[in-house]
Amino acid sequence: MILSSCASQKKFAYDFVKKSKGAKVAFYVPNELKKTNLRIDCNPQNVDLVVLDDEELQDTINSRLRILNKIDDEIFLNVMIMSFEEALKDYDVNLQYWENENTTPDSLHWVVDLSHIEIQELVNYQLTNCEIEGNYEFVKTTTVNVASWFELLNDNNSSFLFTEQNYDEYINDCYYSKDSLNNLVVNVDLHHISIDGLYDFAVMLGKLYAGYSFDYFMNDYVRKELKKRDLEYSEDTYLRYDPYEMYIYYTRNDKLVEIN
């Protein structure tokens, strides 16, 4: 029964891909982003910050922030929406605000409500040996986490879902040299994050969210079709669709996560 069910899942998923062509998606985003500074070097209780007055403290925090205080909400949201719309076309689905008094969510009329986006900036430490075994260095890097909460509808029932992704600095190269006193000095070449890089990341998110939304509706269709036929449905065999290779495959973690 399980093998038969797995085969049936893919069959119904391919059916969904065909039947969903021309579907209309109404996509909504929040008016603004929530921004949270979690950098440990910006904690006002740090010994180097607690002695500062309010103005000095704010100036110091602003100087240490890499991304958070530079984000233009409108730019971030607009590039994400445009990317979402373009990605939908790859699935033969269109962005269209179809809602009216005569139309409700159904198999060809979907709502993707991205109700909340939180962007956090924090510090990480990456451990590297810098090419000398036994000599390990902690390298300070910055991570920007983008967490998003969704409400998805293709019938009268709402589903609430979540996903998060990181925009990270990473080590390009790390090596030791010697100073004038013959002491080892660590040299680290970081791939730095930037505000332009974050907007490029928003483009990636728009494409990802379009794919995740399509996949959710596809799996919802598969679940309902199996239930009609009294076939077993396994949450562990979540399906994704690649519109470029026209291929359906299994995943465990690369998806929207339902919030109970």
Residue spans of the language-model regions?
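Short beta-strand->alpha-helix linker/helix-N-cap micro-motif
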Residues: 93-105
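A structural "domain/chain start" motif
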Residues: 6-86, 223-260
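A subset of solvent-exposed loop/turn segments in beta-rich extracellular surface proteins, enriched
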Residues: 50-55, 128-135, 175-187
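Sec-exported extracytoplasmic/periplasmic mature domains
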Residues: 85-93
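Short secondary-structure boundary motifs at beta->alpha junctions and helix caps
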Residues: 63-70, 153-227
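Surface-exposed short loop/turn segments
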Residues: 104-165, 170, 254-260
